[in-house]
């Protein structure tokens, strides 16, 4: 080894923390280190295949791709090597000294507080890759050279995982990467051939590159290499020949998820656009699914050649939880992310994959309600972005949505729109719903009093996305949606409002005039209502104006919100209203009316512009009683 230049580096602080957590966490599933290293080696070979399309010289006269594993019991080492793309010195610093993932700091911070079993699961989910070597190793060395570079541009990386690493310039005859693990004394089980073969069979059987292990022929006294995996792309096989276990292990390899997938769909499509898709629905949401920089998307292959990870050209954002791959026969091998965006083939594939994904969810919802509920609890809020993003598939998306309602007596969202419609009253014209900040707030809204009395179900929407979603979800199966906190003629029919108002007494008419004079332009209008049973008054939004919940969303996003003026509705049958109606003293009357408006606004909005004034007025009126 000709050493030319040696430097000492410190790990990025997040790497130090992660290594410390792994080394000292007694990680229970230690064998995954080999899966991670083989997966990295396979990716390196995929990248070389792709780059050599435009630059064949990268092959260096060696196109026999392979991953090799050798054991040296006397030295206590396990060596994993590949003849893939390799790394430059800069690549080594960036890939083996840092973690270039957004949200890493917050992830590690949350990890430190978790219980051991949850911590182990999250470590696997985050995808620690190469760093998992330190779970079983006291020291790790990496020898690598980037394909196409001179032999004297090899790099040696060494570390014990305690805070620093060394990088040395070396000569390396062959391209690719060789990782040597100096195993801890208590991890010597990984020096046994049967153990390594078992791990490869369990996790890496589907790797498209041959994984070979070095063995010794006692009879002929020679070492030889034996292939120990199938080395065939799982997605290219007939799905009738693939076991459930094989799909599950392939999913884990593809995603770094430690859990089995909830459901999957494997399809070979022939015709104008020939492609294979293998789509998975995870059991749990990724830790960073709400991170704007979350790298979602499908793995893209063209004619079995790996092109890129996380291609977002084939699925919209509301389906970002779906994992998997697409292998196209029609896209060009030199396709880039930019070309994908404007490619007609891509657009056709996207339409097909969206349909395929939604149909997969539909199948799951009909085939296994329990599993679909698991899916909904994890990803329902993400799918709710669909109506705003995908008008072409609105009805299909709507059929997949789940809600809770006043008749459900539970906050669990498990009612489909089909089920709601099937339980509608014979003369019920619309699908009623209410949006609120929480389930409890929605469940106890005074707007529900009439519906409880008449046994009419109302959907209770309390996710942050709900109000936004309902702007796009306007009808389903011919039934329009109606917010019960907005003015609507169908609500008037339920209470025979017009008939009741014809019988309004002169005294009550004068009362309304007096209320309007007191409130002035604080409200849009004042009127009586007969849909309240326990509450003296409520406020309603005009049917054409912004709702309360939408105003909250705009405000939370830092956008300007127009002043909301509500319709003030008063229940003439409530004892408090009847008592206030008889008050002759103008100042006292005004105070009571202002208090009632504040109560109604507080019930609607959950806050008041001047809570101190409200408290003072309440205290004053209580003392006067």
Swiss-Prot record:
<dbReference type="InterPro" id="IPR037196">
    <property type="entry name" value="HSP90_C"/>
</dbReference>
<dbReference type="InterPro" id="IPR020575">
    <property type="entry name" value="Hsp90_N"/>
</dbReference>
<protein>
    <recommendedName>
        <fullName>Chaperone protein HtpG</fullName>
    </recommendedName>
</protein>
<dbReference type="Pfam" id="PF13589">
    <property type="entry name" value="HATPase_c_3"/>
</dbReference>
<dbReference type="InterPro" id="IPR036890">
    <property type="entry name" value="HATPase_C_sf"/>
</dbReference>
<keyword id="KW-0067">ATP-binding</keyword>
<keyword id="KW-0346">Stress response</keyword>
<dbReference type="GO" id="GO:0140662">
    <property type="term" value="F:ATP-dependent protein folding chaperone"/>
</dbReference>
<dbReference type="GO" id="GO:0016887">
    <property type="term" value="F:ATP hydrolysis activity"/>
</dbReference>
<feature type="region of interest" description="C">
    <location>
        <begin position="553"/>
        <end position="625"/>
    </location>
</feature>
<dbReference type="GO" id="GO:0005737">
    <property type="term" value="C:cytoplasm"/>
</dbReference>
<keyword id="KW-0963">Cytoplasm</keyword>
<feature type="region of interest" description="B">
    <location>
        <begin position="338"/>
        <end position="552"/>
    </location>
</feature>
<dbReference type="InterPro" id="IPR019805">
    <property type="entry name" value="Heat_shock_protein_90_CS"/>
</dbReference>
<feature type="region of interest" description="A; substrate-binding">
    <location>
        <begin position="1"/>
        <end position="337"/>
    </location>
</feature>
<dbReference type="GO" id="GO:0005524">
    <property type="term" value="F:ATP binding"/>
</dbReference>
<keyword id="KW-0143">Chaperone</keyword>
<comment type="function">
    <text>Molecular chaperone. Has ATPase activity.</text>
</comment>
<comment type="similarity">
    <text>Belongs to the heat shock protein 90 family.</text>
</comment>
<dbReference type="GO" id="GO:0051082">
    <property type="term" value="F:unfolded protein binding"/>
</dbReference>
<dbReference type="InterPro" id="IPR020568">
    <property type="entry name" value="Ribosomal_Su5_D2-typ_SF"/>
</dbReference>
<dbReference type="InterPro" id="IPR001404">
    <property type="entry name" value="Hsp90_fam"/>
</dbReference>
<dbReference type="Pfam" id="PF00183">
    <property type="entry name" value="HSP90"/>
</dbReference>
<comment type="subunit">
    <text>Homodimer.</text>
</comment>
<keyword id="KW-0547">Nucleotide-binding</keyword>
């Amino acid at each position: 080894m000709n050493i030319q230049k040696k430097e000492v580096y410190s790990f990025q602080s997040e790497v130090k923390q992660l290594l410390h957590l792994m080394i000292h966490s007694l990680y229970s599933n230690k064998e995954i280190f080999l899966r991670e290293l083989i997966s990295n080696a396979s990716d390196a070979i995929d990248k070389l295949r792709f780059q050599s399309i435009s630059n064949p010289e990268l092959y260096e006269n060696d196109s026999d791709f392979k991953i090799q594993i050798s054991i040296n019991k006397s030295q206590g080492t396990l060596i994993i090597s590949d003849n893939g793309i390799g790394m430059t010195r800069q690549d080594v610093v960036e890939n083996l000294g840092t973690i270039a993932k957004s949200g890493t700091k917050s992830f590690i911070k949350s990890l430190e507080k978790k219980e051991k079993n949850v911590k182990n699961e999250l470590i696997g989910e985050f995808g620690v890759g190469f760093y998992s070597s330190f779970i079983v190793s006291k020291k790790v060395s990496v020898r690598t050279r980037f394909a196409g570079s001179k032999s004297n541009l090899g790099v040696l990386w060494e570390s014990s995982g305690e805070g620093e690493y060394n990088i040395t310039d070396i000569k390396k005859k062959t391209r690719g990467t060789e990782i040597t693990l100096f195993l801890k004394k208590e991890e010597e089980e990984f020096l046994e051939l049967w153990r390594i073969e078992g791990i490869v069979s369990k996790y890496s059987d589907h790797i498209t590159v041959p994984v070979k292990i070095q063995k010794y022929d006692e009879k002929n006294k020679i070492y030889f290499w034996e292939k120990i995996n199938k080395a065939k792309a799982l997605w290219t096989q007939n799905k009738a020949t693939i076991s459930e276990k094989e799909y599950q292990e392939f999913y884990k390899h593809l995603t770094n998820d430690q859990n089995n997938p909830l459901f999957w769909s494997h399809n070979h499509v022939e015709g104008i656009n020939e492609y294979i898709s293998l789509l998975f629905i995870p059991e749990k949401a990724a830790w960073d699914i709400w991170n704007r920089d979350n790298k979602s998307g499908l793995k893209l292959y063209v004619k079995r050649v790996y092109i890129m990870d996380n291609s977002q050209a084939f699925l919209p954002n509301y389906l970002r939880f779906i994992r998997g791959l697409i292998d196209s026969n029609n896209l060009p091998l030199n396709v880039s992310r930019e070309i994908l965006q404007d490619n007609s083939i891509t657009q056709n594939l996207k339409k097909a994959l969206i349909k395929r994904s939604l149909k997969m969810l539909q199948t799951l919802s009909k085939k296994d309600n329990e599993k679909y509920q698991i899916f909904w609890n994890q990803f329902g809020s993400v799918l709710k972005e669909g109506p705003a993003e995908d008008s072409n598939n609105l009805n299909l998306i709507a059929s997949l949505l789940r809600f809770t309602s006043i008749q459900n007596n539970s906050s669990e969202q498990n009612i489909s729109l089909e089920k709601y419609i099937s339980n509608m009253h014979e003369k019920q014209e619309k699908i009623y719903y209410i949006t609120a900040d929480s389930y409890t707030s929605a469940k106890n809204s005074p707007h529900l009093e009439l519906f409880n009395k008449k046994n009419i179900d109302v959907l209770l929407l309390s996710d942050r996305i709900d109000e936004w979603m309902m702007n796009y979800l306007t009808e389903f199966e011919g039934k329009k949606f109606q917010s019960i906190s907005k003015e609507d003629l169908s609500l008037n029919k339920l209470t025979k409002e017009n008939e009741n108002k014809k019988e309004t007494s002169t005294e009550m008419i004068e009362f309304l005039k007096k209320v309007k004079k007191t409130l002035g332009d604080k409200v849009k209008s004042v009127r009586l209502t007969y849909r309240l049973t326990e509450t003296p008054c409520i406020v309603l939004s005009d049917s054409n104006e912004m709702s309360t919940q939408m105003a909250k969303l705009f405000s939370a996003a830092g956008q300007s919100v127009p002043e909301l003026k509500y319709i003030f509705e008063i229940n003439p049958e409530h004892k408090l209203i009847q008592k206030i109606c008889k008050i002759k003293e103008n100042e006292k009357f005004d105070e009571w009316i202002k208090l009632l408006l504040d109560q109604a606004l507080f019930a609607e909005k959950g806050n008041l512009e001047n809570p101190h004034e409200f408290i003072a007025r309440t205290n004053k009126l209580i003392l006067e009683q």
